[in-house]
Amino acid sequence: MHLSSSLLFTSALLAGGINASPATNAYRRQGADMRTIIGDTTPVLSNTTAVHFPGSGDFFSVTERWDVYRPPSYQAAITPTTEADIVSLVKMAKQHNIPFLATGGRHGYGTSLGKCQEGLAIDLSHFKDVKIDKQRETVTIGPGVVFADVFPVVSDAGYQVQTGTCSCVGMIGATIGAGIGRLDGVHGLVIDALESVRMITANGDIVEASKTKNPELFWGIRGAGANFGIITQATYKMHKSMGDIISFDLIYEPEQNVTLFNTVANMYLPPGLTVETIMSYNQTTEKPTIIVSSTYAGGSEAEARRWMQPLLRLNPWYKDIKAIPWKRMSKETALGLDKEVCANSQVFDIYGVNLRRHDANTWVKTFNKLAKFWNEQPAAQSSSVVLETWPNQAVVAVPDSETAYPWRDATTYVMIQMRWDAPGNPVETVADAMGRELRNDFAKTSGYNGLTVYVNYAHGDETPEQMYGRNKLHRLAKLKKQYDPSSVFGFHNPLPTSYP
């Protein structure tokens, strides 16, 4: 969940790039003028495809990002309206060595995306179809679809499907990094619902991947999918609706931090219960605060209250408990801050950490460091730390070998969000240093052998092993070499083409 100025919220987007060494250097295109190249390509594009250059009316609207911390930059943006047009654009970019990002929700924030400079934006916002197949109990979507588009269509058909937490994130982009969310314990990761994809490769070929078609590619897509191509269609298995979600929004005094963190760290979570703990600064009370946003799926409010007793008996000073339809879960949980969180052009300097061990002392130390930081750096008081403690019963029920995603045993995903008002604020240096320090603290007591990170929460400075897992990298590198040997799709937490 990414937090806004007072609080909140999650994920990665479908992205690609062209770079011989994307992990180390920003790539700027050199050679023929991009306007000329695009002009030469335009005759093969459909007449509904739109081309935008900086200064034109729609250029900003099709390139504006959620996070403006170390962003990519573009010489042009193109909004294709057919799959064939996307193929033509990929071939054009590869032929002329043009770096590009193919964007859906434009919600990705890893700093590796910022290595794409003066490139091409392939805006996939036209591809917004959400189609239900009740007979097969599936939903098929395009790359322009965000979670907010999926909720009402799936819910009104009588189903639910795994999603992320924030409504404005691109569903396919979040999926291909694994996709974590509030139904993890019941149904598993979002990739566990994925049945098939249709993808354009670096050569401009269209391939399909599933457990029966190109199964090795399908394995890699489920956890590292941004590295292999542009997904133009994805189909997911739906689940019969479990009814309303029970939501708990609780706020605690800062003095309760030791008791609260020990309670959360030692609390049993049944499959339907999630606990999100948010350390933030309250601008109204002018003091640190701790927010807990919990949800319970698959049971009654009375049942949910029984499971939540360890937290309720701590007597939070604010308490809002209610049943909400699943389709409004993103918008009405976590104090209803989804709209504020989803505002574009904000600064989010994000660091992520996986935990499989809950060390309450580390959480207490983090809160105390933040309290001191907020007091000394008022320009960064919108910074926060979010701990998403999701039950993982259904996640670990899927064999580790089934997908490329390596961290199924994680029990909490930490998102450290360092924030300030606008790019260029001098507080950036000290805020970024604090983010790194907190990440290191969590990693030391995480229960893993060093830092590991859910790739959708990666900052961009992590090693491939820390994102993709040492035991998965040899197989992933072989796939990368097979489908994208020149790293055309190399700006979103890129894979190597050989390992070790």
Swiss-Prot record:
Name of the protein described by the UniProt record: FAD-linked oxidoreductase srdI
Pfam families noted in UniProt: BBE (PF08031), FAD_binding_4 (PF01565)
Boundaries of every FAD-binding PCMH-type domain copy: 69-241
Record: glycosylation sites: N47, N257, N282
Family label: Belongs to the oxygen-dependent FAD-linked oxidoreductase family.
Function (record text): FAD-linked oxidoreductase; part of the gene cluster that mediates the biosynthesis of sordarial, a salicylic aldehyde structurally related to the phytotoxin pyriculol. The most interesting aspect of this pathway is formation of an aromatic product from the highly reducing polyketide synthase srdA. SrdA synthesizes a reduced polyketide chain from one molecule of acetyl-CoA and five molecules of malonyl-CoA. The polyketide chain is then reductively released as an aldehyde.
PANTHER family: BINDING OXIDOREDUCTASE, PUTATIVE (AFU_ORTHOLOGUE AFUA_1G17690)-RELATED, FAD-LINKED OXIDOREDUCTASE AFOF
Gene name of the record: srdI
